[in-house]
C-alpha cells in the first residue's frame, strides 16, 4: 500500500523537506566535478522577501539545482548587505518606538553602532529565513555579511590600492543630497516624480547703464513688439536659488541678445553684478531664451560653471536651510565682495587661497529659513520690487529620495571619488570581446551607453553605519590613507605627538558590493582564499539580476574584479525584467498592490492582508482606497499555493521582456498542476503495488514507445532551455509533457495494457509508468523541488533506487532510452489520440453516457489506417467503449450517423437508439462552422505575404498541410450533413 497522502497539501511537507535537506548538507559544494557558481545579489539586511527577490532567486535556484544534478560542484554564494542608509533609518525608528528618549545623536557614534549590531543579531536574518521557505538551495554556512571582518578587510584593501594608484581622490563636487538623512545618496536612490509646480518669470536688470532693442514676433514672423529694455526676463522653477546665481546665459547665436555678450546684470535682492555668458546648452525656443546659472545647486549648471570658470555659491546648510556664508570660513579668510572685481577671476584667487568655494553675503532676511520658506519670501520681495513678471503652472520632474520622500538637493560638498575613465574603458572591452555575455544580448547597448558616458563615482556617505573610510587627517588638514592608524603613523613617520583623526564618513554600500564576487572567496587573505576556493569558484558562472542595477552593481563588479584580480567576475549576466502587477503597474506600498511571496506560499486572510497593506503608509489618507481595492480583488484573502506553485509561475512568466505582469490566477493554475502530478503519482503507485524494476524498460506496447520518445524530446528541450535561460519555454515544455503527454494521455493509454490478459505487456507498462514518472520528477525538480521530492521518495524504491534524495540524483539526458526505432509507434499513438479525441467529442455532443457502448463504422481509409486499427483495436475499444468496429467500402451507403474525420478516415457512429436526428444536425452544423473557422485561419496566414516570405519554410509547409487536413474534414462533414 502506498503511504502517499490522498490529497496534495504543500503545507504538510515543504518545511519538513527543507529542514531535512539543510541538515543533511545537500547544499554544500561537493568539491568534485566542474565548478558552477552563482552569486546572490545581497539583499539589504533590513529587508524582507519581496516578489523581485522571489523571482530572481527562483531562477537562480533552478540553475543551481539543475547543475548540481548534472554533477557540477555547485556554489550558490549568499549573504546580506549592511545597507547603510536603510539600516540607520530602521534602528533610529526602533529607538523612537522604544520610548526611552534615545536617538542616534544622543547615543553618539559608538553607542549607535552598538545598537545597530544588537538589532542585526536579533532581526538581521529575517530575509534568509524567508529564502529558505522559497526553497533556495544555497550553502548557508558560507553566508556573508558585508560588515563581517573578511569583507571589511577587502574593502580597506581595495580603497588603499586604488588610492595609491591615483584612482581615488578627495574633492569638491555636486552630489545628490538628502536633507533629512544629511548625506549624499546615489542616483539609484533618487526617484524622479512628475509633480505640479510653477514657472516664475523674473526681471534681472542690466548693469552699467546697458540697454538693448527687444523685438517680438508672432508665429507667422510678424513683428508684434519693439521696445528698448534695460533688463532681461529669466524663467525659473526654483526662485530661491537665484540668491546663488553667478551668471545668466544666452545662446551665442540668439539674435535677440547679440549686443549683450559679456554684459553684466544686477542680481535682484542682492545687488551683486554677475556676467551674461553664452553657451550652446541654452534652448533658444524655451521661454525668453535667457537662463539663470546656479552652479552649486543644479547638475547642468555645474557643468556650465566648469566650462566658464564660474564661482560655486553654496546656499544651503546640510538640512536645506539658507546658510550664513560666514560660517564656512575663518574670519580672516572670508572673501570681501567688491562689485568691481570679475567674479570669475575672484573665484580663481579664492580657490588658490583657501581651497574653498566662493562665499558672499546673503541678505539676513533669508538666513536660517527652510528652502521653501525662503522661496515664499523671495517671491514676496520680488513682487514688492516689481520684478515678478509672470507665474504660470508647470509640470516638474522632482527628484525625491526613495527612503525619505524628501526633495533631493544638488549640493556642493567635499567627498571621496573614484576616477572611472580607465576602469570603464577596460570594463567595456571585457564585454565587447565576449569574455562576459549578456542575456538577452540587447542589454549590452545599455551597458555600453553607461560606460561611455560615465562620470567619477562619489563613494563617501555622511553616515555612521558602514565601512569607515581609511583616511586620517592631522591638524593641518593633511590626509593620510592606510589600512589602519598604526600603518599610517609608521609609513609617514608620525609620532604620538601628532594628533590624527579618522575621516568620519563611510563608504557607500555599492563600494563593498562591487567586491562581492571575490571578497566572499577570501580576498585578499591568501589563507582565506585557499580555504574558500578562490581559484576554483572565480569567475562565477552566471549573475542573475535586474536591469535597474546594470550600472550601479554589474558594471562596478566587472571593473573592480578585473582591477583587483585580473579576472572577470562572471561569464554570463542574465538580466531579468521588472515584476509588475497584473495590470502592468509597478508594485509599491503606496499603491497598495504589493504581493508578499510568503502570502502566496502560505496563504493569508483578508483581514491580515488589509492590515499589512494599510500599515505604515507614507500617505495615510490612501488607506481607505487601498482597503477597498484589496477587498474587491481578494474577498476571501489568498489561498495556500505552496512554494512549488509560486516557483513554477515565476518560471512560466520569465520571458526576456523588460516588464513581467504577475497574475495570481496563474499561481492557482500551477497549484492545480502540482495536484495533477500528485494524483497521477497515486494512480501509478496504486497500479504498481509490489513492483520492483531496474534499468530501462523494454516496451511492449506502442503507447510505451510513444511516451518514451516524448520523454526523450522533453529532456532535450529542457537542456536547451536551461542553456539559453529561457525559463518560460522550459516551464511550457515541462507542463506540456507532464500534464498532457503523461497525466492525460499515457495514464489513460496504459489502462488497456494494465487490464489486459497479456502479462508481459502489463509488466512492461508498469515499468514504463514508473520509469517515465521518476524521470519526469527529476526533470521538474529544479523548478518544483518540494512536490517532486515528496513524490520521488515513494516512486524511487520501486525502481531499485536507494539514494536518500532526488536532489542528488543525476539529471535525465537525451538518449537515456534509445527511441530511434519508435517512429512508427509515435505516429500510431498520435493517430490513436486523434481518433480518441474525435470520438469522445462525438459522444460528448450526443450526450452518450460514458458507460454506454457504441458501434463504430470506418470508411474512406488510407493504406495505413486498416493496419493501425488492427494493431490498436483493443485500445480503441477500451478507451471509447466500442461495441464493435466495422469497415464500410468506399461509396457504400451508410445509416444515419454522427460523423468525425481523422485525416482521410471517416468515423461514423450510427445514431439509431442514441439520439434524435435534429440534435445530430445541430451538432454537425456546429462542427462544420468550427472547421470553417480553422480553414479561415489557415487561409489568413497563407494569404499574408509577410508570413509566407518571413516564416521558416517548414512552418509555411506545416500550415499548408493543416489547411489540407481541415479541408478534407470539411468535405466529409458536409457529406454526412447532407445524408441526414
From Swiss-Prot:
UniProt xrefs under InterPro entries: aa-tRNA-synth_I_CS, aa-tRNA-synth_Ia, Anticodon_Ia_Val, M/V/L/I-tRNA-synth_anticd-bd, Rossmann-like_a/b/a_fold, tRNA-bd_arm, tRNAsynth_Ia_anticodon-bd, Val-tRNA_synth_C_sf
Protein name: Valine--tRNA ligase
Keywords (A to Z) from UniProt: Aminoacyl-tRNA synthetase, ATP-binding, Coiled coil, Cytoplasm, Ligase, Nucleotide-binding, Protein biosynthesis
Main location: cytoplasm
GO term, biological process aspect, one: valyl-tRNA aminoacylation
Catalytic activity: tRNA(Val) + L-valine + ATP = L-valyl-tRNA(Val) + AMP + diphosphate
EC number: 6.1.1.9
Role summary: Catalyzes the attachment of valine to tRNA(Val). As ValRS can inadvertently accommodate and process structurally similar amino acids such as threonine, to avoid such errors, it has a 'posttransfer' editing activity that hydrolyzes mischarged Thr-tRNA(Val) in a tRNA-dependent manner.
GO CC terms in record: cytosol
Written domain comment of the UniProt record: ValRS has two distinct active sites: one for aminoacylation and one for editing. The misactivated threonine is translocated from the active site to the editing site.
Family: Belongs to the class-I aminoacyl-tRNA synthetase family. ValS type 1 subfamily.
HAMAP family per UniProt: Val_tRNA_synth_type1 (MF_02004)
Localisation per UniProt entry: Cytoplasm
Class of the enzyme per the UniProt entry, highest EC level: ligase
Species this protein is from: Xanthomonas euvesicatoria pv. vesicatoria (strain 85-10)
Motif ('HIGH' region): 43-53
Coiled coil: 914-978
Classification via Pfam families: Anticodon_1, tRNA-synt_1, Val_tRNA-synt_C
